């Protein structure tokens, strides 16, 4: 199973279209972690399972998404309602409550990934307004490949190229 995660494009339609066009057919699902600032009816949003972010005023997206793909339970939130700037504990509790195998979030504009008690926690970073150590990449998103043994996480830059230093493999055991 392969899932693509993107977040915080803040109205940048072009980058979402490029990502969708490039990876359509290569991934099983595309998840958007919020702050798209685009209407759900916008054609560019159609490939993405999207949640509402703190700057998505008046847009009709859910607060959470739970997608089941090839027996993997993928939970997506924006993060602002779960204090992800300070701790992952509320998100971890929500992930366990939903029996998620992957919990993805945005909001911080900084990529992050870790595996805790068999659950992968992933922030794809902001595709349009990155912050922190990897800001120089101009934006990031991630593709997670999952099999029975491991989570394989590859981050990509804004030019849709894999970032060699941002490839992580986590055992599911």
Segments predicted by a language model, with ranges:
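Core catalytic region of metal-dependent phosphoesterases/phosphodiesterases
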Residues: 2-70
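Active-site-proximal beta-strand elements of phosphoester/diester hydrolases
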Residues: 2-8, 73-80, 120-125
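Active-site environment of divalent metal-dependent phosphoester hydrolases
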Residues: 10-15, 36-41, 55-60, 82-87, ...
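A short, polar/proline- and glycine-enriched secondary-structure boundary/capping micro-motif
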Residues: 15-16, 85-89, 133, 161-169
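Conserved beta-sheet core of the metallophosphoesterase superfamily
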Residues: 49, 85-150
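Short strand-coil-strand connectors
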Residues: 70-71, 117, 158
């Amino acid at each position: 199973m392969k899932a693509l995660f993107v977040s915080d494009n803040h109205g940048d339609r072009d980058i979402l279209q490029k990502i969708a066009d490039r990876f359509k057919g290569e991934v099983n699902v595309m998840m958007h972690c919020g702050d798209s600032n685009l209407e759900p009816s916008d054609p560019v949003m159609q490939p993405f399972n999207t949640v509402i972010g703190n700057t998505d005023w008046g847009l009709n997206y859910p607060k959470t998404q739970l997608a089941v793909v090839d027996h993997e339970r993928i939970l997506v939130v924006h993060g602002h309602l779960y204090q992800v700037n300070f701790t992952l504990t509320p998100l971890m509790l929500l992930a366990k409550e939903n029996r998620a195998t992957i919990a993805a979030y945005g909001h911080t504009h900084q990529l992050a990934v870790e595996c805790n008690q068999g659950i992968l926690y992933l922030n794809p970073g902001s595709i349009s307004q990155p912050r922190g150590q990897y800001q120089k990449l101009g934006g990031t998103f991630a593709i997670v490949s999952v099999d029975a043994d491991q989570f394989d996480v590859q981050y990509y830059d804004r030019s849709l190229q894999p970032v060699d230093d941002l490839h992580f493999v986590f055992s599911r055991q």
